[in-house]
């Protein structure tokens, strides 16, 4: 069988042209997809503002997570505890994922965003003002709940508003907006630390987030 297979393979001709989806579509196809997604969002006012508000609330705490360990060390939490904290975050995410939809079933998208904003604000102001180690650890778990609400509840609302044919492209465009916001917020907090402490920088970012979202959320 081996030799028969070898003979068959040896008689096969190499393909004359290798096709590449990336090459066929070209780099500019990315912008075409984003153009389609932006049109989809602009046609539905609720979808547009839901995507923007969600990007702000979700991206802000995700952008500053890298600074958690600095604040932990500033208040005396030793590095050996970090692993337990991050394990607790994963546990919180798993736990809330199982029943978060039951809790938020009666909520509108606006209500879910408001809960996310409250949790994000508690995180920023907690890391800005708290000095108690246990309270800081508890507050550090809040972004995990924000992630669950975003992944389960907000995604459900968005999927109901997006036409089936452009769902993947529109969601990708929303993620792209979130990525830009993360970069901007990360750059902003880095610049702030040149003038104020990392704790005060958290308070400033948190205040800016609350002010922005108190305008954005009612639009949803």
Description of each model-found segment:
Residues 1, 188-210:
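A membrane-interface helix-boundary motif in multi-pass transporters
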Residues 1-13, 49-70, 82-105, 116, ...:
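Substrate-agnostic recognition of the 12-TM MFS/MFS-like secondary transporter fold
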Residues 2-6, 94, 118-122, 206-213:
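Small-residue-rich packing faces within the transmembrane alpha-helices of Major Facilitator Superfamily
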Residues 5-25, 217-220:
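Helix-loop junctions on the cytosolic side of multi-pass membrane transporters
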Residues 14-52:
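Juxtamembrane intracellular "pre-TM" segments in multi-pass secondary transporters
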Residues 70-76:
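Membrane-interface helix caps of multi-pass secondary transporters
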Residues 111-126:
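Structural signature of the two symmetry-related core transmembrane helices
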Residues 126-140:
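Helix-loop junctions at membrane interfaces in 12-TM secondary transporters
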């Amino acid at each position: 069988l081996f030799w028969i297979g070898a003979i068959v393979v040896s008689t096969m001709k190499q393909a004359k042209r290798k096709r590449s989806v990336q090459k066929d579509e070209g780099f500019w196809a990315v912008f075409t997809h984003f153009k389609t997604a932006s049109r989809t969002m602009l046609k539905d006012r609720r979808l547009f503002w839901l995507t923007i508000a969600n990007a702000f609330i979700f991206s802000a705490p995700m952008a500053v997570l890298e600074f958690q360990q600095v604040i932990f060390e500033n208040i005396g939490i030793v590095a050996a505890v970090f692993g337990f904290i991050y394990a607790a975050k994963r546990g919180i995410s798993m736990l809330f994922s199982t029943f978060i939809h039951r809790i938020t079933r009666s909520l509108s998208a606006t209500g879910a965003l408001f809960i996310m904003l409250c949790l994000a604000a508690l995180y920023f102001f907690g890391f800005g003002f708290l000095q108690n180690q246990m309270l800081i650890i508890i507050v550090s778990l809040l972004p995990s709940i924000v992630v669950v609400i975003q992944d389960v509840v907000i995604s459900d609302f968005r999927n109901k508003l997006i036409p089936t044919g452009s769902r993947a492209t529109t969601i990708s465009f929303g993620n792209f907006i979130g990525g830009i916001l993360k970069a901007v917020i990360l750059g902003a907090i880095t610049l702030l630390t040149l003038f104020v402490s990392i704790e005060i920088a958290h308070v400033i970012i948190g205040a800016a987030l609350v002010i922005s979202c108190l305008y954005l959320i009612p639009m949803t």
